[in-house]
């Protein structure tokens, strides 16, 4: 992505239940979170039940920074949940890290959440009027308080989850820890991914299947939209929560967010991205000498474009993975410097050549010109930019912090205007129809709200107020 900081995903979640009470699950959760680190790098946390109480450790930074062997040893228990976070609502501070926990008359619950609750402000105000106290500014803590409130009234967690689901508008994949019981929830249209696996007597859920691979578990199935899974004493109970004929799987998981070695709702992400590259060539061929990806997420699409076109594939840009995110840079000049630090050209692959540059998406476009300048300074004769995601014209309200509508470069500009701003010789976006075909899930089962404004849930009554809140909390 040209300026990866332009888009941030909400989170990654993990839940593990071992039938063997002598088996500690904290280390397995740690490794699973490591595999999901790409979904969030601001904070990480793990909660386990040790037979008497829910233990939690959270911290700011990467998984490897937050946990060490001593901390993992303290988190005893055969059942637990984990979380990695990027902020889409709520500031980046320790109070907003997850898992969250809440106490009720019978004990304590802990939750980890991936998604975004559109009506969280209204729900929070309602809870505060009832006397609930909040320690964070996130929508995820609202869910935690709602569950504890419902459980106080009727101590049945399946019932409580169903009641809370009726109140939530937005996206949510949840893992809920209640003593030795683990509950797993996916929203009625399945916006965020969630999968289920087994390893012997251990059962695992996670945002992506790569979390299963690292701990040697076998992917069994996806948690279906509207399903509740209850894990207890080695058994799994699947409950239909909110049946819905519509599905709305996030298309951006396939385009950018998910790791290419994941399988999301039955679709191999790497294969989808290869398809995108092949389709880009069919829709937007170019006379060129080399196909170059913007690393890393665009590599499969570039390979696909190269195969379809017969134009050689080349690694023309090298990514420095130790540079901080460019969105923290206050001025455009500093952001452009950060791009130069993050992406360095291989002059021998670019000089005097006509380049097909493959990227997954353009959101604001604020750092795109800087990267194009880098490639031109390396001696590229022509640059033909091909984008695997159709123009992003509307914001995401479901857990991807990309931009407000006025910040989106494609919201008020056509392709030719964007081409001139970015400074490339030609620009081609994949069409929505081809993207749907590449993913292999029919359009009515994908969320394409950011592309065409067709959102799967009601939107906030005051969009401007909601977007202002989101902007201030990033």
UniProtKB/Swiss-Prot annotation:
Keyword annotations: 4Fe-4S, Glutamine amidotransferase, Glycosyltransferase, Iron, Iron-sulfur, Magnesium, Metal-binding, Purine biosynthesis, Transferase
Domain of life per record: Archaea
Start and end residues of each Glutamine amidotransferase type-2 domain: 11-234
Cofactor-binding details, from the entry: Binds 1 Mg(2+) ion per subunit. Binds 1 [4Fe-4S] cluster per subunit.
Needed cofactors: Mg(2+); [4Fe-4S] cluster
Residues annotated to bind [4Fe-4S] cluster: 250, 396, 447, 450
Maturation-removed propeptide residues: 1-10
Binding positions (Mg(2+)): 297, 359-360
EC number: 2.4.2.14
Record's catalysed reaction(s): 5-phospho-beta-D-ribosylamine + L-glutamate + diphosphate = 5-phospho-alpha-D-ribose 1-diphosphate + L-glutamine + H2O
Active-site annotation: 11
Example of a GO biological process term: 'de novo' IMP biosynthetic process
Leading EC class: transferase
Pfam families referenced in this protein's UniProt entry, alphabetically: GATase_6, Pribosyltran
Pathway the protein contributes to: Purine metabolism; IMP biosynthesis via de novo pathway; N(1)-(5-phospho-D-ribosyl)glycinamide from 5-phospho-alpha-D-ribose 1-diphosphate: step 1/2
Disulfide bridge positions per record: none
Keyword Metal-binding listed: yes
Family: In the C-terminal section; belongs to the purine/pyrimidine phosphoribosyltransferase family.
Function recorded in the entry: Catalyzes the formation of phosphoribosylamine from phosphoribosylpyrophosphate (PRPP) and glutamine.
Annotated NCBIfam families: purF (TIGR01134)
Protein name in UniProt: Amidophosphoribosyltransferase
Gene name tied to this protein: purF
């Amino acid at each position: 992505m040209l300026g990866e900081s332009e888009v941030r995903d909400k989170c990654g979640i993990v839940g593990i239940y071992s039938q063997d009470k002598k088996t500690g699950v904290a280390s397995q959760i740690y490794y699973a979170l490591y595999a999901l680190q790409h979904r969030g790098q601001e904070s990480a946390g793990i909660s386990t039940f040790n037979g008497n109480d829910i233990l939690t450790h959270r911290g700011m930074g990467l998984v490897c920074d937050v946990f060490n062997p001593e901390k993992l040893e303290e988190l005893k228990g055969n059942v637990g949940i984990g979380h990695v976070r990027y902020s889409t609502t709520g500031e980046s501070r320790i109070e907003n890290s997850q898992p969250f926990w809440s106490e009720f008359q019978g004990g304590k619950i802990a939750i980890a959440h991936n998604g975004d609750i559109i009506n969280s402000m209204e729900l929070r105000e309602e809870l505060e009027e009832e006397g609930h106290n909040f320690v964070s500014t996130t929508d995820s803590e609202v869910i935690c308080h709602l569950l504890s409130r419902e459980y106080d009234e009727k101590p049945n967690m399946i019932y409580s989850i169903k009641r809370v689901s009726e109140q939530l508008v937005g996206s949510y994949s949840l893992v809920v820890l209640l003593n030795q019981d683990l509950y797993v929830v996916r929203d009625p249209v399945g916006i965020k991914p969630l999968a289920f696996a087994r390893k012997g007597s251990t059962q695992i859920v996670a945002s992506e299947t790569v979390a299963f691979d690292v701990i040697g578990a076998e992917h069994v199935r996806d948690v279906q939209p509207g399903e509740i899974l209850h894990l207890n004493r080695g058994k799994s109970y699947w409950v239909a929560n909110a049946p819905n004929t519509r599905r709305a799987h996030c298309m951006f998981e396939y385009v950018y967010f998910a790791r290419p070695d994941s399988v999301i709702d039955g679709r191999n992400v790497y294969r989808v991205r290869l398809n995108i590259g092949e389709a880009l060539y069919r829709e937007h061929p170019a006379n060129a000498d080399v196909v170059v990806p913007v690393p890393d997420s665009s590599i499969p699409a570039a390979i696909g474009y190269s195969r379809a076109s017969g134009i050689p594939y080349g690694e023309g840009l090298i990514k420095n993975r130790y540079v901080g995110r460019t969105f923290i840079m206050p001025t455009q000049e500093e952001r452009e410097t950060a791009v130069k630090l993050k992406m360095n050209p291989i002059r021998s692959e670019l000089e005097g050549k006509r380049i097909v540059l493959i990227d997954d998406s353009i959101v604001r476009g604020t750092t795109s010109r800087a990267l194009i300048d880098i490639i031109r300074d390396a001696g590229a004769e022509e640059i033909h930019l091909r984008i695997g995601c159709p123009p992003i014209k509307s914001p995401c309200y479901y857990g991807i912090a990309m931009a407000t509508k006025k910040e989106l470069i494609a919201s008020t500009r056509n392709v030719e205007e964007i081409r001139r701003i970015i400074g490339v010789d030609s620009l081609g976006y994949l069409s929505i129809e081809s993207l749907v075909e590449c993913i292999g899930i029919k359009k009515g089962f994908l969320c394409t709200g950011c592309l065409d404004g067709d959102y799967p849930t009601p939107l906030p009554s005051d969009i401007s107020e909601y977007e202002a809140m989101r902007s201030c909390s990033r």
